Amino acid sequence: MDIPDFSSISSRPTIFEFEGISMINHFTENWEKVKNFQARPDDILIATYPKAGTTWVSYILDLLYFGENAPEEHTSQPIYMRVPFLESCFKVIASGTELADNMTTSPRLIKTHLPVQLIPKSFWEQNSRVVYVARNAKDNVVSYFHFDRMNIVEPDPGDWNTFLHRFMDGKSVFGPWYDHVNGYWEKKQTYSNLLYLFYEDLVEDTGREVDRLCSFLGLSTSVSDREKITKDVQFDAMKQNKMTNYSTLPVMDFKISPFMRKGKVGDWKNHFTVAQNEQFDEVYKEKMKNATVKFRTEI
């Protein structure tokens, strides 16, 4: 396995407005190819707000489809090569669209953090299946903060309070969390090929959610295979697995924080002060006043 050389990326990117949301250059420089990406009817798009369970669900789907057929891939190819990140564009590695276009497997598993309004229209036109994963805002912002601390291709997060307020204001990369989770929830009402999963449900009963995925995708995976996959995708197993824990990517400083940190529900209680929690709840109530999607901040 060739490890990409990211040494040429020496400074963190700056945030700017793009298509109505906050973005960084690594996700906009290939925009024409992203926008005009040609989806296929059997593609499966894994969509999430950053740090909401993308890698977890990517790995579940990868094992469901290819665990038996290509076991060697799971020990030699990291997940970010097996499930291309559609909008990613780093000069030192093939872009997400290029990786996806060159995939020989079927179905293609492709991940994105784009809000629903920026998804390439061919996915909808081809009636591709979309698996969306949503995570409660409080745990999501904590995970996003630690991720940005350890990842040099992300903007400088500043201190916790600064990062929290940027998130509350909807100025994090990939835009407001509120719009992201609501946008896909509303799309689900009119687009039947979209499955909406909750991170909290995955933590609570991974096997049940694997069953839901199989049902949605029309897979007849045996009970024993489902049980094995459920075991293989538990947090501690994935955290130790070099093909899923991103330890092969040199842009991440694991001395600051691991890519897979805790994988729990309710860790926000270790970060929010009482004042921050009250302020967050006030903003949340206003931003989500018309939303019908509901979240659990503890299980």
Swiss-Prot record:
Record's family? Belongs to the sulfotransferase 1 family.
Transferase found in the keyword field? yes
Q: Name one GO biological process term.
A: xenobiotic metabolic process
* UniProt-recorded name of the protein: Cytosolic sulfotransferase 1
Report the principal subcellular site.
Answer: cytoplasm
UniProt-listed InterPro entries: P-loop_NTPase (IPR027417), Sulfotransferase_dom (IPR000863)
UniProt-listed SUPFAM superfamilies: P-loop containing nucleoside triphosphate hydrolases
* Any matching Pfam family: Sulfotransfer_1
The Swiss-Prot or TrEMBL record annotates one GO molecular function as: sulfotransferase activity
Q: What is its EC number?
A: 2.8.2.-
What pH dependence does Swiss-Prot or TrEMBL list here? Optimum pH is 6.0-9.0.
Per the Swiss-Prot or TrEMBL record, the active site comprises: H113
PANTHER family hit by this protein: SULFOTRANSFERASE SULT
- Compartment(s): Cytoplasm
Q: Which UniProt keywords apply?
A: Catecholamine metabolism, Cytoplasm, Transferase
Activity modulation notes: Inhibited by Co(2+), Zn(2+), Cd(2+) and Pb(2+) ions. Inactivated by Hg(2+) and Cu(2+) ions.
Role, per record: Sulfotransferase that utilizes 3'-phospho-5'-adenylyl sulfate (PAPS) as sulfonate donor to catalyze the sulfate conjugation of a variety of xenobiotic and endogenous compounds, including 2-naphthol, hydroxychlorobiphenyls, dopamine and T3 (triiodo-L-thyronine).
Supply one GO CC term from the record: cytoplasm
Summarize the temperature dependence annotation: Thermostable from 20 to 43 degrees Celsius.
Residues annotated for 3'-phosphoadenylyl sulfate binding in this entry:
51-56, 135, 143, 199, 233-238, 261-263
**Tissue/organ expression:** Expressed in liver.
